[in-house]
Amino acid sequence: MAIKPKYVKQLGTLLLEEYPQAFNTDFETNKESVETLTNVESKGVRNRIAGYITRKKGSNTPPSASA
């Protein structure tokens, strides 16, 4: 797993603080939200930010018990 660039973390964190209701654990909806809330033109950067937000939103769920 790669370390995300600083600009991805900064923008992702800013978006989560400003618009927490606009994001959830679904990558596709987060991708659309990033597109509407920012002026990012690059598809790759948009997807990286959406992926970062998706991981941050999903990290609040407890791990499933496996055994």
From Swiss-Prot:
SUPFAM superfamilies: Rps17e-like. The keyword Cytoplasm does not apply. Transmembrane segments: none annotated. One of its GO terms (molecular function) is structural constituent of ribosome. One of its GO terms (biological process) is translation. InterPro entries: Ribosomal_eS17, Ribosomal_eS17_CS, Ribosomal_eS17_sf. Keywords: Ribonucleoprotein, Ribosomal protein. Pfam families: Ribosomal_S17e. PROSITE patterns: RIBOSOMAL_S17E. Coiled coil: none annotated. The keyword Heme does not apply. GO terms for cellular component: cytosol; ribonucleoprotein complex; ribosome. Gene3D superfamilies: Ribosomal protein S17e-like. HAMAP family: Ribosomal_eS17 (MF_00511). Belongs to the eukaryotic ribosomal protein eS17 family. This is Small ribosomal subunit protein eS17. It comes from Haloquadratum walsbyi (strain DSM 16790 / HBSQ001).
